[in-house]
Amino acid sequence: MASGPGAATLKKCLEVLRDARNDSEQLAALLLVTKAVRAGDLDSKTRRQIFDAIGFTFPNRLLSSRQAPPGCPEHTFRALGLTLLACFCTEPELAGHSQVLNKIPTFADVLLSPCQPDCTSMVDDAYQCLAAVLATPRGPREMVTKGAASALCQAYVNGGYGSERALALLLGLLAVSEAKCWQRDAPHLLAVLSKLSEEFVRAEDGSQFELCELLPRFIPLSPPLAEVSQGSECVRQLYKGLASILGSKLSQSQRDPALKLAASLTQACGSEWIPAGSTGSKFLALLVNLACVEVRLTLEEPEPLEVEGKKEVVTACYVLIEMGIQECLKEEESLLDEAQRMQLMRIMEEAFGAVVFYLRQVKEEELQDPFVFASVRILGAWMAEETSSLKQEICELLPFLVRYARKLFKEGGPAENLPQTAGLVSSDSSILGQDALRFLLPGFCHLTAEDRPRDILISEGAPALLCDYFLHQWGVLTSQPGSLTSTEMSLQTLCGIFLNLVVTAPNLIRQEKTFSSLMDTLLKSLPFLLPQKDHLVLAANIATLGLVMARILSSSAVLQKTGSAKEFFRATICFLSQAHTAQADPGSHGLALAVSPAYVSAWDDIRELWFLGMQALASCVPLFPWLPQAVLQAQWLEELSELLTRVTAASVDFELIAAFQGVLVGLARASKPCREVILSHHGEEWANLYGMAALEQCLSKQ
């Protein structure tokens, strides 16, 4: 408790409060208590004594009162009630009490009311209460739902007394409840961003670098910033300010926050925040160049990340470099010309050399560091697109990448639907549950097509890991309703990797037990997936992979007359047989062969898979005696005969004719009933018409 005369006075006041017989006596004692509270610092025990003597009831009545003692300002009672609550709120236990949380609208109202010179203490008390509430477990959520977030925004934009405290509280609230704040109060937050953006463009005294630190908190990832007019204007202002800053000579402490702000804009808007034209293209090239230089200068040091805050800066640079990769690969509407692309690719290659160098130094105890994850993630983005550079360095790093991905997958389990970009990570956040494999898969798909990296991946046990990962991702897709784009893309890429392995390392498929488990999952998954038309690309991948694996694993137990095997082949027949149809030919009065309407939108993605699937099905026919019967039951031969009879021969290209002939010959040789169906539907005639010599020969034999 405070010492000296103040302590004695406070003690007497507390006695009066406890013994008060009416409101007048209690109010008189409260006024003395308030004076004592303001006069000096109180310890926790004293504050608790005040609360025990007063409770919440009387302050609540003071806050709701619209009267005042004769000769006093009308807000006297409210000011007294706020002072008491501000005193109580210094105790965390009381700050989180429902009686305080219920007063959040009152605190917000004080911030938005016109502040007279004699009201500043009320505003101070309201801010003190809100700051205390923010520090409690329930506080941030209650502040959002009860209107404190919007009030803080308005208080800052209005620029009245205490507006800087409003901004500080907003920053704290966004740090813990960003998504909820934007979901509920986007217009008010955009108003704050608008004010900050205008200040940013005008600032010339060094404060623009302080604003670079603040602004990322007010840049939302969703909804997209550029979709609303107010947001678009903010983006324009921020670009203008950053272009001015980054075009000047900067110290390290000035450049770092500018790069982080640019990365935040990139995460929110991609490259769309940078205007088209030569000015924008030069700025983008400068930005990516600066990011690459920063990565090299930092990661090539012996102790690269000892400096405080360096990880956040380099991670921001990763976001900018990823934007550079995407712009260099754009075929249309790229901000960069060809010369700029070539230059940036060379500069980025040097930066990724530094990333590889850093990752090779990572120790076992550092594997949980989020910065390692960010570095692996951005390297995965490079490996997905650039397959010719740093090949030797990547090969040497592959054992680490496989080990790292396995550790995260086995220990944490993959986290679904992480943002695709490299991401700004906090140095103290956990990577438990983050999914490194997802970002490495496209690169692995390229590498499994090449001998040396494929051999390294196999020797490090990557195929078994990838099989386990496929089974897990399939479980995620089937257990969570709705569209899981990233999960589906991962499954498609995994199918591409396995197709590479089937073609180049068939013995591996026979010997690795996990591929039998994978085969079993493929057999069961296609019948489930195919009826869902929005998953056609994944279904095509699974159908084709299952067929080519079935050729290798035909003698395995999982494929021997099992119900799931027959269901799978029925589904593949359905997928392959429904890809083409007859439609009116604009160039003639006849019909032309065309891709079926249900397949048109996906055909570019599944065309090669369809042809490979037809080839694999033909190879499977002699291996599975019951397969021709499945084709007969599906009536595919009748439908194909009718299709080839109806359309003009000129509309069927040679590659398609070869695909049909391969399956038809296989069926005619393996099954007398199939041969008879083809013959009974004028097979010899259209075989001759389409130049299917092998089929003609097969049909002519008795």
Curated annotation (Swiss-Prot):
It comes from the Eukaryota. One of its GO terms (cellular component) is dendrite. Belongs to the neurochondrin family. This is Neurochondrin. Pfam families: Neurochondrin (PF05536). Probably involved in signal transduction, in the nervous system. Required for the spatial learning process. May also be involved in neurite outgrowth. Its main location: cytoplasm.
